[in-house]
């Protein structure tokens, strides 16, 4: 799976000033390269590789990505899957990701601007869903939009206690999940919040 990180040149998706660090074990900032100003970051290469490994994408899979960012993970998934719908809430970041994807001929990607923090029913059902930001709780909308046998990767919880979770749709309305590892990830914009008790 790590070989795929070299098939699609990662450095070409990184803002110019950070290209020397493209394969470093770091989250690289995107905001200066995109003027999005939101403090967004590229995932570490090892996290990208782990997500691809866990999702085990097939040529027939339809994928939803929530949070396009640089477009690199989008391109990796598009290389493996039939089609990828990627939704980015920040127009400037969407433009940066779109430019990167177009330069690399990712013609099986649909990139849309919008708020998909609770799901994106437009192209559902999906065989795989990836949330590139964390969410305190996993919205039911994503589970409802998984096809039978579909897999969802999300980082769930609040800092400092977050879990990378893989959810599999076992039947309509039913799913199983496994917590893979602990990590900390920036939250999705407008992520669903748990109900808080007030006294």
Stretches found by the model and what they are:
Residues 52, 56-175:
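Conserved nucleotide-cofactor-binding alpha/beta core module
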Residues 1-64, 72-75, 80, 93-103, ...:
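Class I SAM-dependent transferase core
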